Amino acid sequence: MYSIAISTISNRIETLDLTPYDDIQYVIVHQETHQASPDAVKALSARPDVIYVPLDKKGLSVSRNTALANATGDYVLIMDDDVTFSIDAIHALHDHFKEDDIDVATYYHKFTNGKTTLKKQSAYNHHLLNIANPSSIDICIKNESLLKSNIQFDESFGLGAQYPSGEEMIFLADCLKFGLKVKRYPLEICTHPPVTSGADFFTTKQKILAKAAMFNRIYSKFGRLLFILFVLKKTPKVCQAGYGKFFILNAISSLIERK
């Protein structure tokens, strides 16, 4: 059994398209429930393949953790309310879990405009220096390993939190630090609209601070150095977007503030 952990908010729950499958359980965590149609909520709650969890707390990571706590499937896939998935790709992923005896798998996703995040055609093991690329919707966890490790998303990071990004990279880092086996596979599990929040890490001071805090959270005493290298690498791209000076000044400010 696979648990599809979906975070949704407000009336977005009304647009969910949840195809029934014999081996799929949907765990829907719903924030700002008062803005949704009661009929839509009632219809979903009545389905035997749906676990509906209303949540009155804020934050995407809080929602993710609530979904993980309520999932009862053997494997839990993190997803959003604007994502669709391939059941055949999930079955292929299950084979990899069995063959490689892994605890956490990451993969890739397509976009509705036909583009893809799939860049590498071979599988590889994750370590602390190659976990930056997977999005939350590219993560599947063996539930047994999750319960054993008690790892959660850091609720200080993610949309609606103090730091609005970085939660998925921190989650993978915590898995690795615990000793879980984490591997990436050349599978496209999900399809997502082409606009993603992770692509914008530079248009506000808080987004830049979040990157600095993330590097510090994961790499401790090496975090400052790795953040500086990140800034140097990304500056040309940010300059093309017209935020070069803003990005650099706030990156420097974040380093000073975190002394």
Predicted regions and their residues:
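Short aromatic/hydrophobic "clamp" motif used to bind/position activated sugar donors
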Residues: 76
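Acidic donor-binding segment of Leloir-type glycosyltransferases
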Residues: 13-54
